A protein has these predicted regions:
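Conserved alpha-helix/loop element of class I SAM-dependent methyltransferases that forms part
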Residues: 5-21
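Short SAM/SAH-binding signature in class I
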Residues: 88-96
Length: 166
């Protein structure tokens, strides 16, 4: 039986923000559940799932295999966007890491960052600093979400921020 995934409220909010039909690059994919969910729900045609660490990438590979989605989800070891080539995806997901790390990932590869049509960003910390970074770079925050997880409302930014790249 193929692996069926269900997402936490936080990760569901991130997945729900992806524009239907876009190919996705998931940086820091961890276990690969968001990538698997997006393909299983036929929301996206494919995902490039990347992580810097071997362990999480190996877990993601197991999950993708169990889900029978190897032809739709490409796994790649990458420090941020270093292994990404512009044009491989229209949507960037960067979720579950600190705002400063996320800023570093986006700043280090500006041409790659600017190649995305949308970025779905879910910083876990340093929200004010990260929002200032986005503002200073001229990004438009086009959608935010507030979610209830584990009995607590998480700040709007915890649900995700969609940034329109212009």
């Amino acid at each position: 039986m193929a692996l069926e995934v269900s997402l936490s409220a936080r990760m569901q909010a991130v997945a729900d923000m992806v524009s239907e039909g876009n190919r996705v690059c998931d940086v820091g994919c961890d276990h690969g559940y968001v990538s698997i969910y997006l393909v299983q729900q036929k929301r996206v045609p494919g995902v490039l799932a990347m992580d810097i660490n071997k362990g999480p990438l190996a877990r993601a590979a197991e999950h993708v295999e169990q889900a029978g989605l190897s032809e739709y989800i490409t796994l790649r070891r990458s420090d941020g966007l270093t292994a990404y080539e512009p044009g491989e995806a229209q949507t960037l997901i960067c979720a579950g890491m600190g705002g400063r790390l996320m800023q570093k990932i986006l700043e280090r590869e500006p041409l790659k960052t600017e190649s995305f049509q949308e970025m779905i960003l879910q910083p876990q910390s340093e929200l004010a600093v990260f929002r200032k970074f986005l503002r200073n770079r001229g990004y438009s925050i086009t959608l935010e979400d507030m979610i209830l997880e584990e009995g607590k409302f998480l700040k709007k930014q915890s649900g995700g921020i969609i940034v329109t790249v212009e």
